[in-house]
Every structure is written in structure tokens, then in C-alpha cells.
Amino acid sequence: MMNKLKIIITIITLILCFKVSATDYNPYEESNVKTKTTIYTGTVLKEKDQNKLFAYFGIPYALPPIDKLRWKAPRDIGSPLKVRQATTRPNRCPQLAGTIDSIEEGFNVGEIIGNEDCLYLNIFISEKAKKSKKKLPVMVWIHGGSNVSGHGADVRYTDGDFAFCLL
């Protein structure tokens, strides 16, 4: 009798834990933000203390420096799309994979990763900051890493009452 009770309590606990974890995070939730020329559809990356983190990935700021544009000054992208998906992390710039890349993302140390088509910015903003009616500070971060680690879609420094822009 005692064993049946333990099994029932365990099953109920597991069901409740699954129910709570399934409602805490929705990786498919989308969010739109409008600029003067474009509507960007972003995504919700995580929820922390009931505060969502909105991410807008892959917003181009220049034409890709590939083919005839390689080793030239950046070129304007021209008229942006009217509606743009900003839900996928863009390419990182070419670099040799370092220890952090091998641990976090499964690359081999010293492997060449990335792509020259990498002139994108990524914008992160908390739910509280997004709902604010006042203008907020914007932090622009050009990641370091000496071309051996890091990328503009790294979300480690994004929990603040400001817009965070990573290049």
C-alpha cells in the first residue's frame, strides 16, 4: 500500500513539474517592432522572473563584403524589406574556433567557422524596457574575442532596462 502511494505521489509530482516547465518558456512566441521603413518580427528567447527577453536577429547594416565587394568600404543596403523575419541568428564573422566555441557549440578547436556575410546587428530588449513609454538608453557592444571566440548573437549581457545592440 505504501509503495503504491509513493508511486502515485511521484507521478503527480512529475506531471506538475512538466506542466510548470512547459508554460515557463515558449521559444516559438514572436514579437514585432516597427521602424520608419520596416517591421521586424523577432522572437522571445527566455523568460526570467516573468520578464521576457525579446530578440531581433540579423538586421543588416551593410551589403555583405563578398565577391567584388571584398576589401572595399561597406556599401549601403538600399531600401530594406518592408517586413523582415528577425528570428534566426545570423552568420558569425570568420574566425578560428576556440575552447569556448568547442565547449558551448561543439566546434573543434582551430576549426575555421563563420562566413564573410556577417554584417548584421542583433537587438535584445527586456519586456519591461519594451513596454516603457520613454526613450531608453541603447548599449552598443562590439564583441571582443581576438577573432577566436564570440559573436554578435551572444545573449549573456542582456538583462537590463535598456536596448542592447550587438555587432
Spans of model-derived segments:
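Bacterial N-terminal signal peptides that target proteins for export
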Residues: 1-9
